[in-house]
Swiss-Prot record:
This is Hydroxyacid-oxoacid transhydrogenase, mitochondrial. Only expressed in adult liver. InterPro entries: ADH_Fe/GldA, ADH_Fe_C, Alcohol_dehydrogenase_Fe, HOT. Signal peptide: none annotated. GO terms for molecular function: alcohol dehydrogenase (NAD+) activity; hydroxyacid-oxoacid transhydrogenase activity; metal ion binding. Optimum pH is 7.5. Its EC number is 1.1.99.24. GO terms for cellular component: mitochondrial matrix; mitochondrion. The modification N6-acetyllysine is found at residue 445. Gene3D superfamilies: 3.40.50.1970, Dehydroquinate synthase-like - alpha domain. It is found in: Mitochondrion.
Length: 467
């Protein structure tokens, strides 16, 4: 038996042991050391759902001023980026603040694909401003930057790495109260309006990492489908690929009751807890919407129905993955975007090389799901069927190949670049890509099967070409 196969067998046996019956009759079978957790288990026994309040409706952004007035806000920071600052989403939000007599200051220096430096600049602005509420109008980069600014302005004596996820940071629980934050998403991808996650490039190590805590999730998400009409086609596509992979990955994460360690205190239960019955519902519903509406949303900028559904799908998938988590597509995407050389994506008005997040995630998806289908193959076939595959005669052992082929066709139909080679990578870059994936354990450990460095290298190599 190959070493990798032996490792997976051993892994499965450990999971079966950890998931042993805990009823009074059988709980003595696997005795646990006292004090490990309230249940005495080494794997978790509970999950919880934490999500922002969300409000959906065409033109709902006009209510943001009333919301802040109801909160008693007197000094608001409105964060956005320079591309959006003169466009309707920001103008509508500012008009609402003015109409309701809310004093505000605009910060428009958000960086698309933020870095620790751009986070620190926004944090310094927030600390000096002493704001009592925040509004983030933009995509995931803006919402994540605003979350970080709110957190560190509320905890001014903390070191930046205190709240950054391990192993780069200390991953400390957030114990300070934060100010209200209203998120107004203008792209349909990250679902950041629903999650307690803020992602950035850590420049010193050239890796992406995040701050993950329920405490930083927005107080309210205003999901206004009118904002989707300004998005260029490739922005719609790449944002949609993020929704696609949020749904696929969260549905196939390690189940919550197999995740270890079991927390000794609920405050240390991670935001990403593994698949569970509630997150599963949101993931599958989001996937059905992507299958039905993403191509329409990309191909017709005036298709408000399709773009509205994708805006909701982003939030639905956010509710799912924001609690279940994601795994290899996202873990491997961070070095893909972080180590970018010269590639600049179409329809993105930026002054630096950029592999958009959704594109960096989806390029590895066929290889990843071929690999993960060794666990939960039924779920992989179910997802393939939702995306249009005829699975009536498919063999269960071919689940990964069926899903991979279905994804390739889906991506080809949407003119996705032909693999990592098309965005500037070669086999010579694989060691660096693997090295950049290793710190992403907050997500890679949620993959349904373990992966070695050799496995990761093989996945990157298989992703060099898609078609």
């Amino acid at each position: 038996m190959a070493a990798a196969a032996r490792a997976r067998v051993a892994y499965l046996l450990r999971q079966l042991q950890r998931a042993a019956c805990q009823c009074p009759t059988h709980s003595h079978t696997y005795s646990q050391a006292p004090g490990l957790s309230p249940s005495g288990k080494t794997t978790d026994y509970a999950f919880e759902m934490a999500v922002s309040n969300i409000r959906y409706g065409a033109a709902v952004t006009k209510e943001v001023g009333m919301d802040l007035k109801n909160m008693g806000a007197k000094n608001v920071c409105l964060m956005t980026d320079k591309n959006l600052s003169k466009l309707p989403p920001v103008q509508v939000a500012m008009d609402s603040l003015v109409k309701n007599g809310i004093p505000f200051t605009v910060y428009d220096n958000v960086r698309v694909e933020p870095t620790d430096s751009s986070f620190m600049e926004a944090i310094e602005f927030a600390q000096k401003g002493a704001f009592d509420a925040y509004v983030a109008v933009g995509g995931g980069s803006t919402m994540d930057t605003c979350k970080a600014a709110n957190l560190y302005a509320s905890s001014p004596h903390s070191d930046f790495l205190d709240y950054v996820s391990a192993p780069i940071g200390k991953g400390k629980p957030v114990s300070v109260p934060l100010k209200p934050l209203i998120a107004v998403p203008t792209t349909s991808g990250t679902g950041s309006e629903t999650t307690g996650v803020a992602i950035f490039d850590y420049e010193h190590l050239k890796v992406k990492i995040g701050i993950t805590s329920r405490a930083i999730k927005p107080t309210l998400g205003l999901i206004d489908p009118l904002h989707t009409l300004h998005m260029p086609a490739r922005v719609v596509a790449n944002s949609g690929f993020d929704v696609l992979c949020h749904a696929l990955e969260s549905y196939t994460t390690l189940p919550y009751h197999l995740r270890s360690p079991c927390p000794s205190n609920p405050i240390t239960r991670p935001a990403y807890q593994g698949s569970n019955p509630i997150s599963d519902i949101w993931a599958i519903h989001a996937l059905r919407i992507v299958a039905k509406y993403l191509k329409r949303a990309v191909r017709n900028p005036d298709d408000l129905e399709a773009r509205s559904h994708m805006h909701l799908a982003s939030a639905f998938a956010g509710i799912g993955f924001g609690n279940a988590g994601v795994h290899l597509c996202h873990g491997m995407s961070y070095p893909i975007s972080g180590l970018v050389k010269m590639y600049k994506a179409k329809d993105y008005n930026v002054d630096h090389p950029l592999v958009p997040h959704g594109l960096s995630v989806v390029l590895t998806s066929p290889a990843v799901f071929t690999f993960t289908a060794q666990m939960f193959p039924e779920r992989h076939l179910e997802m393939a069927e939702i995306l249009g595959a005829d699975t009536r005669t498919a063999r269960i052992q071919d689940a990964g190949l069926v899903l991979a082929d279905t994804l390739r066709k889906f991506l080809f139909d949407l003119d996705v670049d032909d693999g990592l080679a098309a965005v500037g990578y070669s086999k010579a870059d694989i060691p660096a890509l693997v090295k950049g994936t290793l710190p992403q354990e907050r997500v890679t450990k949620l993959a349904p099967c373990p992966q070695s460095e050799e496995d990761l290298a093989a996945l990157f190599e298989a992703s060099m070409k898609l078609y």
